[in-house]
């Protein structure tokens, strides 16, 4: 499956989602590895098998095996970190912020790909998962590494588009009526 095949599964009410998905492969503000790694990391973050499989199939020809694994690792490690650090940030009892996390996350320090790419994928996943503390941390690393605000915004936009595709598929499968075109 590919982005084109994924688009054929989207309902009529998701016309804008289809158009946004169509634009993803033409995104030119990111490197090929950054863009296609985003597709994989964000695809798995949706927890929608159809979306994840389609985006991995689209991305695989553009990524090394190490980059493909790193993109999946970004989705996986951020799933853990985003829950934990969102809790410590949102909890009224600030004592939780002082306790050691006791979470193994060595992949962040040694992701097997360019650290900037892994950070970019982690930022987009963190945005999808709604963890402000992680968003701020990854954005700071990316800005220090020289990425522009436009590149960072692009990564989050890619995540938003992918999230919308997953919701559209689920809404259609849940019997939501299609909007008139």
From Swiss-Prot:
Disulfide cysteine pairs (residue numbers): 131-134
GO biological process: cell redox homeostasis; response to oxidative stress
EC number(s) stated in the UniProt entry for this protein: 1.11.1.28
Keywords: Antioxidant, Disulfide bond, Oxidoreductase, Peroxidase, Redox-active center
Record flagged with keyword Oxidoreductase: yes
Superkingdom assignment: Bacteria
Gene Ontology molecular function: any one: peroxiredoxin activity
Active site: 131, 134
Catalytic function, reaction form: N(6)-[(R)-dihydrolipoyl]-L-lysyl-[lipoyl-carrier protein] + a hydroperoxide = N(6)-[(R)-lipoyl]-L-lysyl-[lipoyl-carrier protein] + an alcohol + H2O
Gene3D superfamilies on file: AhpD-like (1.20.1290.10)
Entries under PANTHER family matching the protein: ALKYL HYDROPEROXIDE REDUCTASE AHPD
Recorded family membership: Belongs to the AhpD family.
The name this protein goes by in its record: Alkyl hydroperoxide reductase AhpD
Species name: Azorhizobium caulinodans (strain ATCC 43989 / DSM 5975 / JCM 20966 / LMG 6465 / NBRC 14845 / NCIMB 13405 / ORS 571)
Gene assigned in the entry: ahpD
